[in-house]
């Protein structure tokens, strides 16, 4: 807002399970019950009840300091239904962290609930409006960097960062090292660890403890990767995989970046075999 960059509301989150024949989007009652038969489907109605109950009960975990209860155990103790786990909790968590759905039940329940609480996701009727930058993130980057754009070095990969008394030495590839007063490493933790010439034991322990996984990403126009009902289409579209495997998502870039195009441009993670 301070950069006076235009935004628009774009984020919603539907789930599509081709095997179970289920799809829904929680943005409205009409989208939630886009499949009218879900009005009479006991498992779906049970999932909706469990969502409301979870939103009411889960915040109590935040008052239990030091609780390391796994998410799966917390849900089992609360007797939450299978549909709630498979078609709500796991898809939401796997999509947020782009992680293997099978690992979600091992997440610390308190961490999971705190994230949902901090982002206003433990309520149904008063959720915050998630917004996207009009024209993409490049717009605010342009405005943010205007005062110092002439000092930005592009296409200059850094090989090493070395601490010196009273400063830091940065060694770009194929260039002489440059001394700075201070350096911020705005990159992934494993990359930061790889750049440090002399990491401390604490830095090795912390930066080396965060795992990453690769995701296969494809840009395409195959709308079969979106839910069957256009009413359910959204910026993020989660695919339930019957045989497990890494998280499978399709991002609708026309929605996320407000592309004025007759054909939907889609980005799919880890579901390449389904793309025509």
Predicted regions and their residues:
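Hydrophobic/aromatic-lined pockets within catalytic cores
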Residues: 79-80, 93-101, 145, 149, ...
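Mid-domain catalytic core of redox enzymes
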Residues: 156-276
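Short, basic and Ser/Thr-rich N-terminal targeting/leader segments
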Residues: 8-11, 154, 213
């Amino acid at each position: 807002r301070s950069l006076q960059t235009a935004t628009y509301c774009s984020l919603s989150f539907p789930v599509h399970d081709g095997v179970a024949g289920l799809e829904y989007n929680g943005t409205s009652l009409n989208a939630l019950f886009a499949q009218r038969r879900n009005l009479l489907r006991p498992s779906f109605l049970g999932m909706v009840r469990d969502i409301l109950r979870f939103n009411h009960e889960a915040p109590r975990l935040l008052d239990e300091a030091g609780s390391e209860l796994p998410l799966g155990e917390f849900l089992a103790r609360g007797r939450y239904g299978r549909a709630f786990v498979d078609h709500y909790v796991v898809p939401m968590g796997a999509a947020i962290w782009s992680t293997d759905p099978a690992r979600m039940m091992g997440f610390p329940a308190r961490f999971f609930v705190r994230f949902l609480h901090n982002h206003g996701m433990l309520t149904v009727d008063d959720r915050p409006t998630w917004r996207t930058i009009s024209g993409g993130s490049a717009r605010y980057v342009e405005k943010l960097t205007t005062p110092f754009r002439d000092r930005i070095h592009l296409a200059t990969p850094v090989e090493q960062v070395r601490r010196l008394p009273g400063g830091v030495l940065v060694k770009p590839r194929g260039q002489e090292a440059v001394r700075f007063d201070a350096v911020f490493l705005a990159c992934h933790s494993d990359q930061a660890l790889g750049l440090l010439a002399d990491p401390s034991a604490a830095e090795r322990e912390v930066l080396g403890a965060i795992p990453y996984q690769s995701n296969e990403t494809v840009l395409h126009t195959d709308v079969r990767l979106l839910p069957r009902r256009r009413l359910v289409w959204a910026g993020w579209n989660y695919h339930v995989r019957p045989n497990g495997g890494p998280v499978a998502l399709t991002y609708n870039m026309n929605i996320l970046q407000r592309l004025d195009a007759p054909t939907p441009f889609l980005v799919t993670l880890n579901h390449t075999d389904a793309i025509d």
